[in-house]
Amino acid sequence: MQNTTVHGLYFCHPTSIDGNPELLAVSRRSLSRGDHVTFTASQCRPKRLQCCQWHSCTISSTHIPTKDDLGKSFAYLRLLFSLDYTIADVLLIIGGLLFAICAGIPFPLLGIVFGDLINDLNTVTCSSSDRATADLSSAVRAKVLYVIYITIANFCFIYAHSTCWCLVSERLARRYRRRYFESIIKQEAKFIESLPSGDVVSRLVSDIELVQSGTSEKVGLVISTLSYFVAAYVVAFIKVPKIAGMLVSVVPCFFLMALGGGHYIKKFAGRLAEKVNAATSIASSSLSHLTLVHAFNANDRLEKRFAGYLLQSRKDAVRKATTHAAQLGCLYFIAYSANALAFWEGSQMISKSVADGNSGTSVGAVYTVIFVLIDASFILSQVAPFIHVFASAAGASERLLQVINRPSAIDGTSDSGDKTAAFGEEDIRFRDVHFKYPSRPDVPVLQGVTFNIPPKKHTAIVGPSGGGKSTVVALLERFYDPDSGDVLIGDKNFRDINVRYLRGNIGYVQQEPSLLDRTILENIAYGLVCVTEIVDLVKEAAANANALGFIEALPYGFATNVGTAGNQLSGGQKQRIALARALVREPCLLILDEATAALDSTSEQLIQAALNRVSERVTTVSIAHRLATAKNAHKIVVVQSGRVTEEGSHTDLVSRGGVYAEMVRLQNLGKLSLDDRVISGDMISALNATPETRQLLDEKQAFVDGNRSDITEDTVVADTPSDSRDGSEEEARKKRKRTRSAGFVTRYTFALIRPNLHWVLLGLAMSVIIGGSYSAEAIVFGHTVGSLSPCRSAEAISRDGNLYGLLFFILALVEFGANVVGGCAFGWAADKVLYRIRVLSLRSLLGQTVKWHESEDRTPGTLLTYITGDASALGGITGTTIGLLLATAVNLIGGLVISFSIAWKITIVLFPTIPVLLVSGMMKLRVQKQLAERHQKAFAKATAVTIEAVDNIRAVSAFSLEKQSYQVYGRALRGPYRATIKATFHGNAWLALAFSISNLVYALAYWWGSKQIAEGRYSQTQFFIVMPALLFSTQSCGQMFALAPDISKAGVASSNIVELLTTRSAEDEVTPGSSHSFQPSSSMGAQLRDVHFTYPHRPERPVLKGLNIDIKPGQFCALVGPSGSGKSTTFAMLERFYRPNAGAVVIDGVDVTRQVGTEFRDDIALVPQQNILFEGTVAFNVALGACPGHEPTQEEIEEACRMANIHDVIMTLPQGYQTMCSHDGKQFSGGQRQRLSIARALVRKPRLLLLDESTSALDVESEKRIQEALATLAGRTTVVAIAHRLNTIHRADQIFLIEDGRCIEQGTHQQLIQRSETYRTSVIHQSLET
């Protein structure tokens, strides 16, 4: 192949989905993304990557069914033949059906062979002639060969039907995945937002897994089981009709037990899962927002709520354990009772035959009937759970098909509609538009909105939050259609315009930027539609969005991956990328929804200048709370309560003295002198041109959100050790972890279990009884078979039949009692231990420092596994798992002791087969489990692609990325599908071998046993004691090996839990030299003295460089400065989320960096930049801010909400303060969430209040009300605010100007205007004076 030189950027995507490196090739005329297969199909054909930077690059080219489940099963056939099935699918289904039927027949045939072998043994026992011995040897050899032939056929049939059904399920699941994604990605926003929270994830993960599980090898197993059942009864009725008829009663007994028990287990398990999930949600939110939890010392309140949900689940957990134990006890009782009945009736029939002197009923015939019917009935009872699986699969397919077959009301992939609308040339008109969101149909959002948007002009929409501004934008993008009224461009209705064409003419920047988990280059380039010139356009757009500087400063530049939801970037950085994505397509209509809200005033001014240049040739619609960004608009529309109250230019609206004029008055920073304006005007031009300014724009923004370590605007996070003190503490913890022995872990784990040891001991005692009962059964079984020999008298046969039938029934009662008592004891113990571990784990996690949470690649998700994974694994080992282990161990030891003591010569030959049977049992269970787990894990990343697309559905729709997202999803499916198919072929071979190999061991046992009996070394009774005692018990012990992964997980979990619970928090460690206590006063003072600080994960970039500020008690102070200068980090120091590398943080005269404990936080309240709500009522979220130990009254909560201007909004809700908040609080607007955060801080009645951009999302009126409330705190509360809106802090007693980690200037607003050109420039940028 000939080499090709291509100019551009080539790099390898680091996270390939299917194991093949994913490549992205960008030339100046094309953008290509794909793996090796994709590129080899193209003309370029790259084989390897030779560069990763800009230059000329040469490339060498189980559950039980209910009545509803049974009803749903009738839809199962529609599932198998749904979604464009092919002839290959039909052939696989037919082949799987026929092979499964054939696979059920060999087992009854083996029952006949084994019964004939017993008759042969009876013959040689009754006659000791040489001829009888020779005949026996010949007969045994023939029958052993039959067993071998049947086993081989059985292996082939099982492998064939398992493979066929696995292929059917994988092909069907892939079709469902593709079609569901294709449908969901093109649905309108109204439908997506009407779905319950997590519905799409549930459909993709749960429902498609149900479809896959319900059409997999389980179908073949059920069909073969039904075939086995039918064949078994045919054989039984041919052999001994009377006993067969009696044992028919076993079938309904098994089914009644399974149906009744399964119904209640499902009921209690559902309730249990609901409450545990609620508790897990609390834990997840707490870990995700740890800084807020620490700020309010809310550990105890959240732990109490977490424990409350777990306590509510206790009753259902106990009921579930009791029901499961009773079900298991009934299962064994029915099986042993059926044995007692069958052997007793068989003994009477054989006794009568002997008394009458005819052949009649033979022992072998009785054995065959019991062997095949008890086993068939037992196995058939195991079919019951699969009925639920199949019904669930049918129900899941119906739910999926509802979406798959649903036509989208606003389809962005359709080619229908008008494509001639002249965007940028004609007016856009709203004409009497009314609208309500589907989630709130009783709340009108727009009520007769009418206004025009002139072409190639800038129209700004302003007004209070919740007034309907963003809804206007949503209608322009046609995320929704109006309930009534029209949106027109010229004379064309938006409803009649092709959706893809409409959105292709619009550039859209959301209030909360949405980025996909791709590179920066791709995220910006997604704004292009059918454009070949990419790289230059992307760079130009990035420059216009003031993003080029920080992008090129990143280690991988435009090739940097932004992470899930852009979490590798700061808020300002994401906003600039989103802006560049909108600008790159050079739209006819540019929509900006608070596009510069996260930027400082200088950055905002530079971007605003670029937008002003763009608006000269583009129709621009902007939404803004900062009126400084809207005052130069050609037209301003004031939207209030869903209506247009005013419209006109800035000058006109101010002169009218209406709503807009009042908003301007509230935001105006004060009138500067003419000289100030002239000087500042000259300075602006100079400042915009200086390298220092651009450097400031690229500075990192530290501690951006309140729940994680902050990500700068210039680097992607990399884990690095922190300062020397924290580093030494971490090393000490690692050393303690290494020195903790297995004995220490065991002792600590035992201490966790000790309070419930009596339940565990009771369960262990029952396990010993259960394990011993298997050996007892072998003894009874051997004597029963021996007592039925026709060589004995009729009276002896009848007498012993009564005795051993009674013994079997006694065993049934013992098994029932032991399983019920043991199951309940273990279930209760496991639940209590699990509760204790989960609560202690959450307590320890919330008690660790922020630094600990950020080290060693810890994330909220991985830490949550202590509660969900490790606690469950450790709790499980204290439950039925340990009981099963002990029972199987007793069973195996008892079997070996009995076998060697009764017939050691038989045992010594069969003993080497024990590992074979153990591995057989292990593989049968393990392969089935691994196939299910592999399938689930393989498609996890493909599911993540869908979740990302749905979470960012507005961005996907706005930039017409539906087809591109579908292609990404298709690539994500390709590798996992191939891997799963490959695993199916070799996995099913192990499964078939596991089901078949035990028959060969039985053949060896009968051959060797018959040889020993024929030679007179052992009796038939001894042989039939040894065989079940050794082989049956050994085969059941294979479960012990299948439990090995669970045991291993429990061991690892035990070590993890002990390490967590014994890890001391650094908050409890005090540096010698300070032991002062805090003295309450009316307000709190604070000083930062020569503070130096570097974030642990960015040691090469100091954030604070000798910061000195002095906050006097009772003052209102403000921190201002460019993004990344260290303002939020200052708050982190005051809250002691981190300890400084050097310097002191003094609060009320006490250096808190040297102080033990966190009691000082009781007098501090924080309003973080990110508005965070926890799952719970509104009242709970507000009360969370109260001081530890104090439960605020309803009056205190309402007072705080009134001060935050949110009380009236809460009272309009149907449930008022008892309204439930979701974990993300999405049912509230951004401004409402911010006001709830402020109320949470105010209910604390703090002496020091920290406000980090606390009014950035508020309208002017709400901002005014909160400013008034803060004014009432003067004197008794020290207030420190970080703000980009300078009008919110211009009355501050002291303003600290922070730049590059230092305080470069301080003073009042008027003093800084006179002394600081930087501050004066920011004031002028935000001034609304004309």
UniProtKB/Swiss-Prot annotation:
GO terms for cellular component: membrane; plasma membrane. ATP binds at residues 463-470, 1121-1128. GO terms for molecular function: ABC-type transporter activity; ATP binding; ATP hydrolysis activity; ATPase-coupled transmembrane transporter activity. Residues 717-736 are annotated as: Disordered. It is a multi-pass membrane protein. Coiled coil: none annotated. It catalyses: itraconazole(in) + ATP + H2O = itraconazole(out) + ADP + phosphate + H(+); voriconazole(in) + ATP + H2O = voriconazole(out) + ADP + phosphate + H(+). Its main location: membrane. Keywords: ATP-binding, Cell membrane, Glycoprotein, Membrane, Nucleotide-binding, Repeat, Transmembrane, Transmembrane helix, Transport. CDD domains: ABC_6TM_Pgp_ABCB1_D1_like (cd18577), ABC_6TM_Pgp_ABCB1_D2_like (cd18578). Residues 722-733 have a biased composition (Basic and acidic residues). GO terms for biological process: transmembrane transport. PROSITE patterns: ABC_TM1F, ABC_TRANSPORTER_1, ABC_TRANSPORTER_2. Glycans are attached at N3, N707. It comes from the Eukaryota. It is found in: Cell membrane. Belongs to the ABC transporter superfamily. ABCB family. Multidrug resistance exporter (TC 3.A.1.201) subfamily. Pleiotropic ABC efflux transporter that confers resistance to azoles such as itraconazole and voriconazole. This is ABC multidrug transporter mdr4. It comes from Aspergillus fumigatus (strain ATCC MYA-4609 / CBS 101355 / FGSC A1100 / Af293) (Neosartorya fumigata).
